[in-house]
Amino acid sequence: MTRRILIIDDEEDIREVAGLSLETVAGWEVVLADSGAQGLARAAEHQPDAILLDVMMPGMDGPTTFRELRKNPITSHIPVILLTAKVQSTDQKRFADLGVEAVLFKPFDPLTLSTQISAELGWE
């Protein structure tokens, strides 16, 4: 089954590396967004199987974007994995309290990114 993943990250390099990894290694369809607002629109339009969401973005950050996704009945069911460069113990609790499916860390290994996502979401 071909999966569709939405990657929401303000860093072009991260979007490109993650997108290329998921397309070539896993054969998944990838949709890209460079901001929380664009991500909300693309999530509603493309109905991805999961969303990889950066925590630190200008404007609408990852946690705010996540809450907005959950408010919309069209996107409220989509699993979300946060992507972050740094996590302190207070952040881990905050992310767990949000209700995200998982948190992955930058830098990630492009060769194992799809395996990590599949494991976190029980797609194996």
What are these regions, as identified by a protein language model?
Residues 47-49, 74-79:
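His-Asp phosphorelay/catalytic-motif detector in bacterial-type signaling
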Residues 57:
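Receiver (REC) domain active-site loop signature in two-component systems and cognate sites
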Residues 108-117:
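C-terminal output helix
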Residues 12-31:
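Two-component/phosphorelay signaling modules centered on CheY-like receiver
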Residues 32-50:
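Acidic, metal-coordinating helix/loop segments flanking the phosphotransfer/catalytic sites
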